[in-house]
C-alpha cells in the first residue's frame, strides 16, 4: 500500500499541483517527491533540494556554540521565545512581519493540499522549513500524505500538534469505527497551533 501511495503522490497528485496553473509558485512552498527509485527490492523517492536560505548562515550565539551553521532551519528553532533568545544568533531571527508572511505561506500550502483531497497528517514545526530573514516557508515530508478513503495515515502526528479528538481515541484500534485518525480536519488544528507559535512564540 505504501508503494501505491507514493505512486499517487509523485504521479497524479504531483501533476495536478505542479503542472497546472501556478505550478511554479507551489514548487517554492513544497518540497514534494517527484520520482520513485527501486533497487534490490528497496523503494526510495527523489525530491528537489532545499533552497539555500533554508540552511543557517550564522547558526547559534557565541560563534555557533551549538554547531548548527549550515544545518536545516527546522521551525522548532523559531517557534518559542526561549529557543530564539537563548540559542539563536540575532541575524537568524528575522522580524515579526516575516513570521506573518510565513504563516500565510504555510496556510496556502495546506489549503492547496486539501483542495487536492490530501491531508498531511503530521503537520508540525519539524515538517516545515522556515526562513524568518526572508519570510519564506516550505512544507516538507509529504511522502506520507493521507488520501481519505484510500490511503490511511501512517502516523498520528507530533505531540503539541495532535488534535484533541485524535488523542481522545488513541487507545482504540485503527480498525475501530470510533477511532479518529489524522485527516484534513485535524490538519487544520495543527495549522492553527503552528501559526499561533510563530506569531506569539509560545504554544496555545
Per-range role (PLM):
Residues 182-186, 195-204:
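Conserved C-lobe activation region of Hanks-type protein kinase-like domains
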Residues 166-185:
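Conserved end of the kinase activation segment
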Residues 101-103, 110-132:
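Catalytic-loop of the protein kinase fold
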Residues 126-171:
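Activation segment/activation loop of eukaryotic-type protein kinase catalytic domains
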Residues 30-98, 102, 151:
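Conserved structural core of kinase catalytic domains
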Residues 2-26:
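The N-lobe alphaC helix and its flanking beta3-alphaC-beta4 segment of protein kinase-like domains
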Amino acid at each position: 500500500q505504501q508503494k501505491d501511495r507514493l505512486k499517487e503522490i509523485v504521479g497524479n497528485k504531483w501533476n495536478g499541483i505542479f503542472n497546472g496553473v501556478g505550478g511554479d509558485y507551489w514548487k517554492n512552498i513544497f518540497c514534494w517527491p517527484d520520482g520513485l527509485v527501486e533497487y534490490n527490492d528497496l523503494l526510495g523517492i527523489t525530491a528537489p533540494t532545499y533552497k539555500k536560505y533554508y540552511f543557517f548562515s550564522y547558526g547559534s550565539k557565541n560563534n555557533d556554540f551549538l554547531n548548527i551553521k549550515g544545518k536545516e532551519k527546522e521551525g522548532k528553532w523559531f517557534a518559542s521565545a526561549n529557543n530564539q533568545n537563548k540559542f539563536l544568533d540575532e541575524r537568524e531571527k528575522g522580524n515579526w512581519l516575516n513570521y506573518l508572511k510565513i504563516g500565510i505561506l504555510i496556510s496556502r500550502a495546506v489549503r492547496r493540499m486539501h483542495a487536492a483531497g490530501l491531508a498531511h497528517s503530521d503537520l508540525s514545526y519539524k515538517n516545515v522549513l522556515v526562513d524568518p530573514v526572508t519570510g519564506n516557508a516550505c512544507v516538507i515530508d509529504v511522502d506520507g500524505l493521507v488520501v481519505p478513503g484510500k490511503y490511511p495515515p501512517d502516523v498520528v502526528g507530533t505531540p503539541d500538534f495532535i488534535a484533541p479528538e485524535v488523542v481522545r481515541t488513541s487507545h482504540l484500534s485503527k480498525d475501530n469505527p470510533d477511532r479518529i485518525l489524522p485527516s484534513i480536519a485535524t490538519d487544520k488544528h495543527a495549522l492553527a497551533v503552528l501559526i499561533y507559535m510563530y506569531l506569539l512564540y509560545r504554544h496555545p
